[in-house]
Curated annotation (Swiss-Prot):
Record site: Discriminates between blocked and unblocked aminoacyl-tRNA: 12
Subunit structure: Monomer.
Residues annotated as the enzyme's active site: 22 (proton acceptor)
Ribosomal protein is among the record's keywords: no
HAMAP family (alphabetical): Pept_tRNA_hydro_bact
Transmembrane regions: none
Site for Stabilizes the basic form of H active site to accept a proton, residues: 95
GO cellular component: cytoplasm
MF terms (GO), sorted A to Z: peptidyl-tRNA hydrolase activity; tRNA binding
Taxonomy, superkingdom: Bacteria
Subcellular location per the Swiss-Prot or TrEMBL entry: Cytoplasm
Name under which the protein is recorded: Peptidyl-tRNA hydrolase
Length: 191
């Protein structure tokens, strides 16, 4: 049975993006690092910021690509190759338009659903056989509004909902790391 060794938080690099909906994956790994009193450091060769944490005796590499979202797969594949991590040992945390704010879902494999960060990871890894933690940000209503929506900041109420979803995800992280996916899904997907 595999174990998660790398958690990737998707988002765009730069101050102007750090509080946008598209960066909720980065918010997730930043909270893990903070909870473990660890800081990220830039690894320019691997195109990412990295922090190493120990979660219940499991050594985990937290990765925030320093590429833009559309090229996240470059950093993910470089880190995976460098540390000899298999795709099924990777958890990718990202924003999800098709899930309401405050909801969080765990998924193994599947398509990219139009998410450019996932599309890039699929291309660079050559597979979609990794875990995803999908943090709901809601949908703006029409596809023409999606780009502006994901690149803007959530309202205070929506930010609180997203923060609660992040906390819920962190509460089941030990199960996810140890591939106890059914109990994790049950806790996350049950209201």
């Amino acid at each position: 049975m595999p174990k998660i060794k790398m958690i990737v938080g998707l988002g765009n690099i730069g101050k102007e993006y750090e509080n946008t909906r598209h960066n909720v994956g980065e918010w997730f790994i930043a909270k893990i690092a903070k909870d473990n009193n660890e800081n990220f450091s830039l690894n320019s060769k691997l195109n990412c910021n990295i922090a190493k944490v120990n979660i219940n005796y499991n050594n985990i590499i937290l990765v925030f690509p320093t590429t833009f979202m559309n090229n996240s797969g470059l950093a993910v594949s470089k880190v995976a190759n460098f540390y000899k991590i298999e795709p099924e040992e990777i958890l990718v945390v990202h924003d999800e338009l098709d899930i309401d704010s405050g909801e969080i879902r765990l998924k193994k494999g599947g398509g990219h659903g139009g998410h450019n960060g996932l599309r890039s990871i699929h291309q660079h890894l050559g597979t979609n056989d990794y875990l995803r933690l999908r943090i709901g940000i809601g949908h703006p209503g029409h596809k023409s509004k999606v780009s502006n929506y994901v690149l803007s900041n959530p309202s205070v109420a929506q930010k609180n909902d997203i923060d609660n979803a992040i906390d819920n995800g962190i509460c089941v992280l030990d199960d996810i790391i140890n591939y106890k996916l059914e109990p994790a899904m049950q806790r996350l997907h049950t209201k």
